[in-house]
Amino acid sequence: MDEADARAEFEALQTKIEKADHDYHQKDAPTLSDADYDRLKRRYLALADAFPILAKDGTRVASVGAPAASGFGKVTHAQRMMSLGNAFEDQDVEDFAVGLRRYLGLSSEAPLAFTAEPKIDGLSLSLRYEAGKLVQAATRGDGAVGENVTENARTISDIPQEISGAPEVLEVRGEVYMSHADFEALNARHAETGGKIFANPRNAAAGSLRQLDAEITRARPLRFFAYSWGELSEPLAETQIDAIERLASLGFQTNPLTRCCEQISELLAHYHAIEEQRADLGYDIDGVVYKVNDLSLQERLGFRSTTPRWAIAHKFPAELAWTHLEGIDIQVGRTGALSPVARLHPVTVGGVVVSNATLHNEDYIAGLDSKGAPIRGGKDIRVGDWVQIYRAGDVIPKVADVDLSRRPEGTERYAFPTRCPRCDSPAVREEGDAVRRCSGGLICPAQAVEKLKHFVSRAAFDIEGLGAKQVEQFHSDGWVKEPADIFELQQRYGSGLQQLKNREGWGEKSASALFAAIEDKRRIEFARLIFGLGIRHVGEVAAKDLALHFRTWSALAEAADLARAAALAHRAADEAEIVERQEAQASARRAKISEARNAAVATCAVAPDSQAAWDDLISVDGLGPTVALSLSDAFANPEERAAFDRLIAHLEIIEPDAPADDSPVAGKTVVFTGTLEKMTRAEAKARAEALGAKVSGSVSKKTDILVAGPGAGSKAAKAAELGIQTLDEDGWLDLIGQA
């Protein structure tokens, strides 16, 4: 798979994961099973690992869950509520343990114990106690900010209002759930009274906890299992298992199936034992969680962006179901991507009613992968087919297979549209791209609306009271066609307040609040502005890096303009390479490709200042040519550039703070080589990055410091040749103040 194919799949997965997170965390109505979500997330992370530039461009890798809903007060967690990495096979668990030993520098014989406990399928909750009293309860939200549900949590009998013998500050974390018996009784009562019928216990628990009226929550039979903690004024214990026992002694319910295991074989045996008991537990679980038992090792292992290194969830297998494919709908995204969605006869999969499933792209429908190789045995998907649906997480369900024996006579292969279903512009599939895209740009109403939704999203302008629903309404009414229109709403409509408050769903208070929120966002951080523009491939992380590098809008725009000629030369070279790759014989492929690229570059020679601007763009902390090309295309497109300019006229852009300068290695490029004796390579890398250094795997002119242990070899020789500062391990620790 090349980068273009990987990027197309990565973006599609990102969109699905965002929607699934929203459905699960905000609507309490997941559209996918746990198994499908995990499979999608696993593929997403695998692509990010194989193509690091994608991880930089992506936004969802660095987030957990979904933002807090607007109906509750917001709570900023003192310590983030993290998600968990996933394992799906026994081998994944063994690989997890091997990776931990490698990170910690432990031999295969050294002891490394784990705890194992059921993974409850409910709603995560953080309980804060101060001086023994419950003072706050908050949902996970997006991991950093959750919803204040304190009064509702007080109604749950498993949650103590006061505790004695606890640290002065104690945040207890766990899962709110509903037992099968209580769930069935609740639905039976609702059926009799005409109330809402819940699809599964998880939805019932989440919907019950997130009631604006705490008395409704009180009437719902919610339970709580404690399994972790957040902020502490003093440690609970030295091991995970002892800490859980300490929580139990304080009056919290902990899961009786929690075990401490010395060997991986014990973990796996306990997993399979729990799996066998699953149907008889009386509550929903979707796997088993393993955690390193020694809390000092947990501290050494630390965290990735959204998950702890010291824990993993071993998920149960996906659930499958067969149903009838009633139609194929085409959705158009903000970058013009045409995404096919299967319209299904509703079927229950894993306790969730599924009526739609992703079909990825036209190749997937045709039974081919992006290289033209057959998938599903080459079986295509047709309207009228019986298809197998699976859910492996909380994400959009997927069509896994087709039953040809039940295919109706007279069905025809699906003809993927070559024109946009929304604006009738040509839908073009570029060489090397798995996705067909509408070429209409901003004249396409679907793209315009999706871009506006992106513009007001949480990571972009985050305008209170202006969400996806309001954007659709304003666009349909002709009030907002592009981002600049948002800041002209009140001005252009004169008595805008009066016009808005007279519309359905709006009153004087909500209209005034919206205009105030819009005014508040005229001052905007540069990174949020860049991200909010919705430029293809420019994710949240890439936007921050661009903002830090260029610092002002004028500098970024000037660089994009100046680099345009070089960008076009780069694209011409790539296209020549693709043509030659298709035609070249295998035995001479490399030579011919090189010859074609060099010839293309020679015929597209550009001015030195344009080449320098291009080199500057692609050097932005590993941004790469794909993102740089998208940026160049956006600024060179007359309609988009004009829309940018109209928007900028309304804004005061806040420049990013200068990078931290309080570390002797901040901003420097460091390379580690040879054997390190006082820390593992992974620990050294993590510490250097925490101090603001960039860690590279190879020595170059850009390297500032080489840390060389015994057996440094060629890297030390090259560093000496380039005159690069070289330190031994003790010298490095002394430099960073950890000797």
From Swiss-Prot:
It comes from the Bacteria. Residues 660-739 form the BRCT domain. Zn(2+) binds at C420, C423, C438, C444. Its cofactor is Mg(2+); Mn(2+). One of its GO terms (molecular function) is metal ion binding. It holds the Pfam family DNA_ligase_aden. DNA ligase that catalyzes the formation of phosphodiester linkages between 5'-phosphoryl and 3'-hydroxyl groups in double-stranded DNA using NAD as a coenzyme and as the energy source for the reaction. It is essential for DNA replication and repair of damaged DNA. Belongs to the NAD-dependent DNA ligase family. LigA subfamily. NCBIfam families: dnlj, PRK07956.1. This is DNA ligase. The gene is ligA.
